[in-house]
Amino acid sequence: TRRSSDLSIWTARVMVTDAQQKVYVLDGNVPILVQRTTMEETLDVEARSHVEMFHHFFFTLAPDDKYIRYTMDKAMYLVDETGLAQYNTLKEKGFYNNIMGTSAVFSIFCDSINFNEEKMEFTYYGRQRIERRTSILTRELVTAGKLKRVPRTDNNPHGLLIVDWRTLLNKDIEQKNKNNF
């Protein structure tokens, strides 16, 4: 019986370990088995998503001071003091007041993100569209930085922090006048 109780304990342990590897998600009332993954297995996807999310919050701007504060608050959870320094520099230069004064709307479009998993470094390539009353300006934007692992939170769902963030290129590529009737 000692042998059968050892076998029972071993079998139970295997079943519990197996059950812990299974995750179910409810679709309505139907449970669906999903594959559990580790951060290492999804790092490339999560890193790119994190970088794109930060750029969306930092560079999508509307002529609304509450909206700007909201998006900057969100962006600051995703970046270290290098992002805060850029924000403060722009604020001191009156950049955000100018947006409100001219009713400019800024949108960002990601072209690609190169991510080196080994070095945890990224380069972001995108275009920014700046729509003003009389014109639309398109700018080319290239930024770079590194990623550092941090605990996941509601404000930082990927558990990554952008560090040493800098702008490598931010230049005008096209200016169009609007036809105002």
Indicate residue ranges for each PLM-predicted region.
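N-terminal/domain-start segments enriched in small and hydrophobic, helix-friendly residues
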Residues: 15, 39-41, 45-47, 156, ...
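Short, small-residue-biased leader/transition segments that mark boundaries at the very start
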Residues: 1-4
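Surface-exposed, charged secondary-structure patches
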Residues: 102-136
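Amphipathic alpha-helical dimerization/oligomerization modules
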Residues: 128-130, 134-181
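Short extracytoplasmic/periplasmic juxtamembrane "stem" segments immediately C-terminal to an N-terminal membrane anchor
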Residues: 20-40
